[in-house]
């Protein structure tokens, strides 16, 4: 792992050194991991890809750096985020809070809470050589770090980024919290009769299983009643007693 600046604008020497360092890594055929979105999505939807590191990777490969490059799109899905409430505040217009010792102490206290699982799935690999050929860029050879990417190679970078993001989306995991969110957040008061909630959870799970978005999409095996029990365990939802039947509602202050 290595750390880099968030922005390279106006830093030609830094950019040159980073390019050369990346080239030296790829020449040795060392696996490299980076996140095209540049950060974690606040909404669950994919962010627009940031292609800086990807462009450097393609540049290094066009200089003859190591074996053919293969990108493995990787999906990460969280059932519950430690920063959930903070994200809701940011989406409501509140300014992003600066990191502090007090914030670190608050985060440490949250460790005792149950946050569920982190789901990981792998999408269909993207082969750089195939995309280069599709954009008539497979003949390009760069001799030095200072040579800019020609238009065909720039188009290749954008195409690779798009393919990676699409393949991440096709490898999504529909977990219990995803289904609970779909059912409860679509109601006016974020609450629903428990029996109706169970039926809707089962219906959406059957739909996702029988008509999948992609063969790589994975759907939770839990039935509706089990999904509610799981949500109660994570303290994401609550059961409100009622003479006409219990109500399932989202817990207060949930992100």
Locations of regions flagged by a protein language model:
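Membrane-interfacial terminal anchoring regions of lipid-handling membrane enzymes
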Residues: 1-255
């Amino acid at each position: 792992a290595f750390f880099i600046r968030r922005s390279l604008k106006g830093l030609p020497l830094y950019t040159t050194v980073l390019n050369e360092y990346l080239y030296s890594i790829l020449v040795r055929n060392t696996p490299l991991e980076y996140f095209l979105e540049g950060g974690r999505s606040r909404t669950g939807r994919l962010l627009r890809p940031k292609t800086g590191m990807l462009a450097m990777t393609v540049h290094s490969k066009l200089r003859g750096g190591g074996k053919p490059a293969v990108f493995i799109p990787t999906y990460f899905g969280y059932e519950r985020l430690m920063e959930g409430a903070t994200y809701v505040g940011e989406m409501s217009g509140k300014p992003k809070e600066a990191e502090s010792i007090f914030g670190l102490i608050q985060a440490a206290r949250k460790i005792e809470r149950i946050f569920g699982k982190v789901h990981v799935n792998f999408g269909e690999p993207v082969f750089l050589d195939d995309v280069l050929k599709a954009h008539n860029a497979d003949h390009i050879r760069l001799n030095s770090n200072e040579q800019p990417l020609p238009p065909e190679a720039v188009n290749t970078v954008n195409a690779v980024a798009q393919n990676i993001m699409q393949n991440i989306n096709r490898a999504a995991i529909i977990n219990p919290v995803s289904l609970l969110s779909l059912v409860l957040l679509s109601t006016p008061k974020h609450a629903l009769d428990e029996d109706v909630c169970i039926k809707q959870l089962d219906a959406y799970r059957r739909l996702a299983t029988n008509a999948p978005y992609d063969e790589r999409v994975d759907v939770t095996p839990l039935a509706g009643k089990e999904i509610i029990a799981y949500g109660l365990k994570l303290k994401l939802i609550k059961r409100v007693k009622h003479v006409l039947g219990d109500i399932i509602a989202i817990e207060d202050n949930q992100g």
